[in-house]
Amino acid sequence: MLTDRHKEVLKGLLAGILFYLSFSKLNLYFLVFPALFLGIRKNFLRLFSFGFSAFFLSLLWIRIPLIDYGNINPFIAYPALVLLVLFLSLYQFGLTYLLWRVFKFSFFAFPFLYTLVEILRSHLPYGGFPWLLLGVNLVDIPVLRYTLNAGTVFLGSFVVLLISLFPLFNKKEKIFSLAIITPLLIYGFIKETSYRVTHYGLKIALIQPFVPQDVKLNRELFELKYGEIIELVKKAVEKKPDLVVLPESAFPFYLGELEEKGKEILELSKKVPIITGFIEIDEGFKPYNTVVLLKDGRVIEKYRKIKLVPFGEYTPFPFKFFSKYVPYLSFEDYNRGNKVKCFQLNGFSIGTPVCFEVAYPFFVKSFGCEFIAVLTNDAWFRDSEGTFQHMKLARVRAIENEKFFLWVNNTGPSGIISPRGEVIKSIDYGSRGILLFSF
């Protein structure tokens, strides 16, 4: 016989499953609304069960880089994943619940508090984890998606919560909610109906080399792929684009070895400018995740990644201590770049945030360039929910900034994202090829 406590937990788990489906590859984004309506109640058991199951299912893909490529024993990897999910669920849902108690569990206070904690979680600790933000789901909803443009993904999260909890509000709260949502709907309608594609007269080639991560981690195997990558670049150059773009860490040698081992790519850059990712080792033997603009056979500009991935590109304090026991944590920490920049090219400017950096709305906005090319290597996640969630963040950033985004992914998918967040042309996951687009 189910007790009331069991029923609360089960309702929370069901809400968590609906939440996961809204962020899954199935892209059932509309399920976020019933998920929140079912999961958010004054009962902590239901709320925590909702948060834990939602984050656990939605982040289960993290096991792939840990176990398959980090060589971490599953008996260590899965408990580590559970601890991460426990931390995130207590942070997002537990902290919101504690603040909610101060407001005597007013349902109208919940959207404000949850969104406030989302903002906090996106910045702290270790630079934050702006993943699984509720507002992301608006990117597929016409009219409402322009809420993201009006106030970034955080205003989107607030609106998602207002809509989801609307039936639980009293009369005054419903009127106030409508007073917030109605102007945003009008703004979105105006934006949708006045949308026009600007023609820049540019032709861009994106290259998806599809080098699996186990190959990239083996220097000898990766070097065998170099010829295939160069052939793709040659074919792209033959199409006479204004720019060729390759993904993050695209070549099997360091930036400092470019003149010795990358003569072919330098020669090709004399015909067409090339943007590509490299691992760079500085004079102090510290690595950087770097993007370079090659033109006229030399490096014209470079951007060093600023927002590094904790436990992926550096081990934060105090976890370095555990590197003695967990070999995965014993890698050399990457250095951070110190400033964003736009590459100036043929009369237009292009920014190149790398991989995880696309998750940060204000950081991406700070580039201030005419176009954004996100260089990434999602081979770490294969064809998982993580890869889908990552590209969806680029779609959100596109509509926030009302700019074309180029999503250049090693293993795919890669694509062209319009200023209203739509993928207008793409290469599927697992394909090797060239994506040409004129705009």
Curated annotation (Swiss-Prot):
The chain crosses the membrane at residues 13-33, 47-67, 75-95, 97-117, 149-169, 175-195. Signal peptide: none annotated. Keywords: Acyltransferase, Cell inner membrane, Cell membrane, Membrane, Transferase, Transmembrane, Transmembrane helix. Gene3D superfamilies: Carbon-nitrogen hydrolase (3.60.110.10). PROSITE patterns: CN_HYDROLASE. One of its GO terms (biological process) is lipoprotein biosynthetic process. InterPro entries: Apolipo_AcylTrfase, C-N_Hydrolase, C-N_Hydrolase_sf, LNT_N. It is found in: Cell inner membrane. The keyword S-adenosyl-L-methionine does not apply. GO terms for molecular function: N-acyltransferase activity. The active site is at residues 248, 305, 355. The keyword Metal-binding does not apply. It is a multi-pass membrane protein. It comes from the Bacteria. Residues 207-439 form the CN hydrolase domain. Pathway: Protein modification; lipoprotein biosynthesis (N-acyl transfer). Belongs to the CN hydrolase family. Apolipoprotein N-acyltransferase subfamily. PANTHER family: APOLIPOPROTEIN N-ACYLTRANSFERASE. This is Apolipoprotein N-acyltransferase.
